[in-house]
Amino acid sequence: MGKKRRISNKLLLVGAIFTIAIPSVSYAEEVISPENFKSSSNLYEGRNTTVLKTSLYPDTYNYPFNQQFISKLKEANTTIKKVDKRDDENPIISTTLSFIRHMNSEDYKSAFDLTSRSLQKIISKEWLKSYWEGLPVQLQAGSFIEIGEVTQKETNPVHTNVEIQLVFEKMTVPLLIKLDPSGKIDDFQLSMSFSPVAERPSYSKPESFVDKEVVVGSGAFPLPGTLSVPKENGPFPAVILVQGSGATDQDETAFALKPFRDLAEGLASKGIAVLRYNKRTYEHGLKTQFSPFYTVDKETTDDALLVTQFLKNEPLINKNQIYILGHSQGGMMLPKMIEKDQNKNIAGAIVMGGPARTIQDVVLDQFEYLFSIGAMNLDQYKFYKSQFELLNDPNFSGQNPPKDFYLGSAVFWDSIRKIKAAEMSKEQKTPLLIIQGERDYQVQSKIEIPLWKEQLKERDNVDYQLYPKLNHFFTEGDGEISKPDEYYSPANIPEYVINDIAAWVQGKSQLN
């Protein structure tokens, strides 16, 4: 197997995404060590860092945080429902089973024939072979044994999602396969599915709002979403929810947490319409992976602005009261959205756990904390520190990166490395609400909030709200600073956060 195909396997270990770590960093999808970066960095030039998947930490699976998740995958081996021998009459399930069976029997042509025309433009039979052979190696899972439970999950106007459990010697791994309306496989990625997940929050009042299935955009990257609209008489102010980095669904599902579902249902229960959507890197992971010269604007900014224009045409929405809430990297990109909002569609913006500084500076502080609690060793910390120093060099070029730059697409990094959200917001006029959990170890309030306040001290339309008990995903916990494994515990965003956001939006709406 050639080196390039081995690297491609690593690019495809797509799972849940850790907002504000390395851009498009996964929780537990990559196992690329610094040594592997160095031996293969030239293969990444011009690639899409959105699915490059440089690991949350190098050698991700070795950390206690992710070992806890892996141990849960291993436990699933004893309880999985075997269906490989079953003849399933459901054509969606049948196609999914056939796809895996063909690859396991090394019939990659038949597997390839089950994929959509759009996917066939970017992958090949040889690529499928490389992916399948490399999967257990990258996961350190041992030999493939059999297919486990197959579940038809979400169906939206763009894709029908099927989760299939792949039973290996050492663990059972969920693979999320997306089929287009014609029944062809259009995308697939590892799924960091987790059980149990947080239940619907008590403050959600489903009887008070209606969920409307929508599709934003067309062409290669249509994005399915949900518009939650109050049942009262409109028009209503609306909030658009923009995720952090990586491949996240419309609920911004992070292990046991669903923060965007909580926000959407909570705000809709209080008379505010909310639109949330699957991120491009989640709905079209493989296509974005192979898109040349992928930038942070393509990952985050442009789709968010497309959604604002979409809402302008919704009859139940107050066209002058469209707000954007950006979480984590989404919050960091809000000033860029405001800058590019030529039609002045954005009435106000809510920065939810968004950094004031460059992402590489924020991540370095995050890694220092992880090193201090034993979640990262010294060599790994030094490796990333050296990489971030290259990004901070004014002469860094995405088109001609240093030979010792190993973090993936230099084009993507060049598009994001200079963004300083607080500084960009200094001269802008759009009202801001900046909310921050004080226990957040990923975007640390003791560093970021003073910088926001210093840069915006001359502005009179910026409000701040700090929450002593909340972490990066705005759920409560104990201790001065949160730890990564906190995200495994099902929890909801507290109602007091919903109340604060609703009061701010409704207050601004009444002024106009």
Which role does the model predict for each range below?
Residues 195-233:
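N-terminal cap/lid segment of alpha/beta-hydrolase-fold proteins
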Residues 428, 434-436:
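Short beta-strand/loop motif that positions the catalytic acidic residue
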Residues 242-272, 276-298, 370-371, 476-486:
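Cap/lid segment of the alpha/beta-hydrolase catalytic domain
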Residues 84, 94, 109-157:
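Short solvent-exposed beta->alpha transition segments
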Residues 293-314:
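Alpha/beta-hydrolase active-site loop
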Residues 444-455:
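Short alpha-helix in the alpha/beta-hydrolase fold that links the catalytic acid
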Residues 473, 479-512:
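Catalytic active-site module of serine/aspartate enzymes centered on a nucleophile-bearing elbow/loop
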Residues 348-427:
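Accessory cap/linker subdomain of secreted extracellular hydrolases
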